[in-house]
Curated annotation (Swiss-Prot):
Superkingdom to which the source organism belongs: Eukaryota
Protein name: Histone H1E
Bias (Basic residues) ranges: 225-235
Organism, as annotated: Chironomus pallidivittatus
Domain H15: 50-124
Length: 235
């Protein structure tokens, strides 16, 4: 008989679990996130500012206050709040930024202090630019008046040409006189028919005396009829 201790079977070794490379655990693939639908609500338009730019407000405050030692930040804030009716505390960072940048550029002068805590004023050149100078523009129309007078002189020069027209009229008048003289010549030729008055001369007392001679000499009356043709020549 066999020994029962020998008949006991050896325990079966468990197969080793396959390990992932580099000892890392495999992550399950994530499901893609569903995109959120975009809202169709229209964006609200930005409200238009009810005040001018900060730079304009600060410069206006400094020019209006006209402080010899310059305007401080507190004075500028009070002026802006009273003039433009805005929340100055919200604008303080922008005011300080503008003051520092303007001092660096030279558009503002810092009379006292450092940074934005001092007092500020405009440079002399900027004050001259701000003053409007419209007075020199007034004399300009005078030069235009001179040009107009010069044009008038040019207009007067053509008036000197009028004597030429007079000469033309004078030259036309002698021609008219010549035309008028021609009828006078015709009138001078008209008196030619006056010789018709000659027959009056023929009626002379001498002719009346001739019959007396005929009475004395009866033989001569035969010759008188021959003298009648002489009267035709007078016509």
């Amino acid at each position: 008989m066999s020994d029962p201790a020998q008949e006991v079977e050896a325990p079966v070794e468990a197969a080793p679990v396959a390990s992932s490379p580099k000892g890392k655990k495999e992550k399950a693939p994530k499901a893609p996130k569903a995109e959120k639908p975009k809202s169709d609500k229209p964006k609200k338009p930005k409200a238009a500012p009810t005040h001018p730019p900060v730079s304009e407000m600060v410069v206006n405050a400094i020019t209006t206050l006209k402080e010899r030692g310059g305007s401080s930040l507190i004075a500028i804030k009070k002026f802006v709040a009273a003039q433009y009716k805005v929340d100055v505390e919200k604008l303080v960072p922008f005011i300080k930024k503008f003051l520092k940048a303007s001092v660096a550029k030279g558009t503002l002068l810092q009379a006292k202090g450092k940074g934005a805590s001092g007092s500020f004023k405009l440079p002399p050149a900027a004050k001259k630019v701000d003053k409007p100078k419209k007075a020199p523009a007034a004399p300009k129309p005078k030069s235009t008046n001179k040009r107009v007078t010069g044009e008038k002189k040019v207009v007067k020069k053509p008036a000197a040409k009028k004597p030429e027209a007079k000469k033309a009229t004078k030259a036309a008048k002698p021609a008219a006189k010549k035309v008028a003289a021609k009828p006078a010549a015709k009138k001078a030729a008209a008196p030619k028919p006056k010789p018709a008055a000659k027959p009056k001369k023929e009626v002379k007392p001498k002719e009346e005396a001739k019959p007396k001679k005929a009475a004395a000499k009866p033989a001569k009356p035969a010759a008188k009829p021959a003298k009648k043709p002489a009267a035709k020549k007078a016509k």
